[in-house]
């Protein structure tokens, strides 16, 4: 996993934890019975509702934890093996993908868009971190605009 992808995952995780509201109250909300001024409300007896704590937290936290675990594993694997996860073939050597394209009736996709190597290796075109900043800014702005 390259540093751009790791940065995107880290920003997504940070936005998930910052945007998840801890003070959200479920149910009907408000102090329904005691708002009328009579102790116990309209029914004449006070009721105590105890809600159990959520078992796993919000689904957003679970998804963010999974994303963080995947990002951490990818970064750890990338650091353990060096900058790229696969050794590039030298001049005159055939790589894994060259064999299938050189054979008669091969798929002919080469190392283009459809190549797994092009999507997973750290080499190739380098994307700018603008998309990460845009994603983080959008998530932050949505949290600020929320009532």
Swiss-Prot record:
Matching InterPro entries: Shadoo (IPR029238)
Annotated spans, Disordered: 26-45
Gene Ontology BP annotations: protein import into nucleus
Prosequence residues removed at maturation: 123-147
PTM description: N-glycosylated.
PANTHER family: SHADOW OF PRION PROTEIN
Misc. remarks from the entry: This protein is a candidate for 'Pi' factor, a PrP(C)-like protein able to compensate for the absence of PrPC in mice lacking Prnp.
Protein name: Shadow of prion protein
Organism (species): Mus musculus
Taxonomic path: Eukaryota, Metazoa, Chordata, Craniata, Vertebrata
């Amino acid at each position: 996993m390259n540093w751009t992808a790791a940065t995107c995952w880290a920003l997504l995780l940070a936005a998930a934890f910052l945007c998840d509201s801890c003070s959200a109250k479920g149910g009907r909300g408000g102090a329904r019975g005691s708002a009328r001024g009579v102790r116990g409300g309209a029914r004449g007896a006070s009721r105590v509702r105890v809600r159990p704590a959520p078992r796993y937290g919000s689904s957003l936290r679970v998804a963010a934890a999974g994303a963080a675990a995947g990002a951490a594993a990818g970064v750890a694997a990338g650091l353990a093996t060096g900058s790229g996860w696969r050794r590039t073939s030298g001049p005159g050597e055939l790589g894994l993908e060259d064999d299938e394209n050189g054979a008669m009736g091969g798929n002919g996709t080469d190392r283009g868009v459809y190549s797994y190597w092009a999507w997973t290796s750290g080499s190739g075109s380098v994307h700018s971190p603008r998309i990460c900043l845009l994603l983080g800014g959008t998530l932050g702005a949505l949290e600020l605009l929320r009532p």
